[in-house]
A protein has these predicted regions:
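Basic polycationic patches enriched in arginine
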Residues: 2-4, 18
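Small-residue-enriched hydrophobic alpha-helices in membranes
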Residues: 11-33, 60-164
């Protein structure tokens, strides 16, 4: 077994016959841990309840703290959360009181590993063409809140207004 620049020790898995470096395994786990909060925030788009302004503010704050760009957040929604929760958009009596965290973490982790598969991506984009309208309003509100938070607010000096 040859290592690149002898930096990382390769690990061999007999079951899968794949080589993974220690660094890759840890970076994937860190990436998944960072995404869990985002998965739970995005999951509220799929509940059968109406989100209030407070909910959008909370979700936008979580998205801002996550460090992901809006484009990355939309990709996380499309390829990691949407495949898991799209059925809740289709059912007449969908889940409305919340989604089990453990189940959501496991299911989204599986789709995280499948997200680069071309067939998987094609299938998800097909369903998304039909169902995106059900999530579009959420993303529009979140984007506007995130833009307003990042745009610097210029304070108005009342003395300047009075003197003119």
């Amino acid at each position: 077994m040859r290592t690149r620049n002898n930096l990382y020790k390769k690990l061999y898995s007999k079951k899968s016959h794949r080589f993974l470096t220690t660094k890759v395994r840890h970076s994937r786990q860190n990436d998944i841990d960072n995404r869990k909060i985002v998965w739970h925030a995005i999951a509220s788009f799929y509940l059968d309840t109406e989100l209030l302004e407070y909910d959008y503010e909370r979700i936008a704050a979580l998205f801002t703290q996550s460090g992901f760009s809006i484009t990355e957040l939309k990709k996380i929604d499309l390829y990691e959360v949407f495949p898991v929760l799209k059925d809740n958009l289709l059912t007449i009596s969908g889940v409305w009181n919340g989604i089990d965290e453990g189940w959501l973490n496991k299911a989204c982790t599986l789709t995280y590993y499948r997200r680069n598969n071309n067939f998987f991506r094609m299938k998800v984009r097909f369903y998304n063409r039909v169902l995106y309208t059900m999530r579009k309003e959420h993303w529009i509100k979140i984007e506007s809140i995130m833009r307003s938070k990042t745009t610097p607010q210029i304070p108005i000096n009342s003395n300047l207004i009075e003197n003119s």
